[in-house]
């Protein structure tokens, strides 16, 4: 199929440049359209900014002509923390949706087939593409949000215009297998208690503690959580819901905020099927990016939902019989605060294998 790019312009995203506008294409052929491999790699580099447990980045991509395949990397599943492997799937779902967003900003609709190979459970998705009629400002805003999003463990101020923002976040959850709920303020203390209990249960879990120490080490790396992304003891004390990481000697930040005033959201699933959990990761991406577009800060939490007792408590707090998969703090960071440096990511050539390419 002939694809004519007219009035091509590029939108710089940090180290990336994606084609973002002005293509026309014939309606015939559709899935036979082949995307330039360079565009795919640029989009994958942007997509790999997705969050994952301890920034473990448990994904691997294969580009074969115009088809892109996502695989779970079993060597990057943190088994002591993530007993079921669900958090690795959530991270892979998030990177899959980030990729969809990046390709949309480049002018392509991503068609996703989840678990295409019943004989290979590591093969999570295959993606092919058709040209988009028109790239909107909304498509570009979501792609820009990928680079602006951070996992912010500091206390938040109250979210502005929450009523309208919460509606947008609910609309972002498009999977029938996943739901988004908010923990009522009056039940917040019970969630904080569940968070404390979850941490207490892990105090003497040597495998868990070893894993945590490894992924928050002092060494320079392209993975894990750098100390610049962690908080001091006093900062941690002002956020009652969260994982206990090794504390840092950072100067007290956001003293004007006081105690955390974030809204607490829960993404849960109607079953625990691997496909559903993968979709939940995609919905996590959608909620995080929509919140970022709205100018809000976010922090994903799984310390409570990693253990069945914690999941049961969270389900009762939202009044559902679903399985809570991830908690999201959403709130306001001070407007004049400088955006912290991004957490590191592995080089794209370590993550992406190109078997055949198109130009």
Range-by-range predicted roles:
Residues 2-359:
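Acidic, surface-exposed loops and disordered segments
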